[in-house]
């Protein structure tokens, strides 16, 4: 259910500012978005998986905070 190493590397490659940039807000938001998409698909098939639903809410909250931070910085 989690992103594979190759998927994460591809996301980092597409959204990084420079080589090996894993900590920038853009990269973190992109990774969270991919994880949220996977969790949403999982929850469509398993609607009573409350542990995953909580994880989805936490990831959404973290992404929202990062987007707000990025908007304030730029």
UniProtKB/Swiss-Prot annotation:
Organism superkingdom: Bacteria
Xref: Pfam families: Ribosomal_S15
GO biological process, one term: translation
Keyword Ribosomal protein recorded: yes
Record keyword rRNA-binding present: yes
Cited InterPro entries: Ribosomal_uS15 (IPR000589), Ribosomal_uS15_bac-type (IPR005290), uS15_NS1_RNA-bd_sf (IPR009068)
PROSITE patterns per record: RIBOSOMAL_S15 (PS00362)
Keywords of this entry: Ribonucleoprotein, Ribosomal protein, RNA-binding, rRNA-binding
GO annotation, cellular component aspect: cytosolic small ribosomal subunit
Gene Ontology MF terms in the entry: rRNA binding; structural constituent of ribosome
Quaternary state and interactors: Part of the 30S ribosomal subunit. Forms a bridge to the 50S subunit in the 70S ribosome, contacting the 23S rRNA.
Recorded family membership: Belongs to the universal ribosomal protein uS15 family.
Function: One of the primary rRNA binding proteins, it binds directly to 16S rRNA where it helps nucleate assembly of the platform of the 30S subunit by binding and bridging several RNA helices of the 16S rRNA.
Record's protein name: Small ribosomal subunit protein uS15
């Amino acid at each position: 259910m989690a992103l594979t190493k190759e998927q994460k590397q591809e996301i980092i490659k597409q959204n990084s500012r420079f080589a090996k940039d894993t900590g920038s807000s853009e990269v973190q938001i992109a990774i969270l978005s991919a994880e949220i998409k996977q969790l949403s698909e999982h929850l469509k098939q398993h609607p009573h998986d409350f542990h995953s639903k909580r994880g989805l809410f936490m990831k959404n909250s973290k992404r929202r905070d990062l987007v707000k931070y990025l908007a304030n910085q730029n």
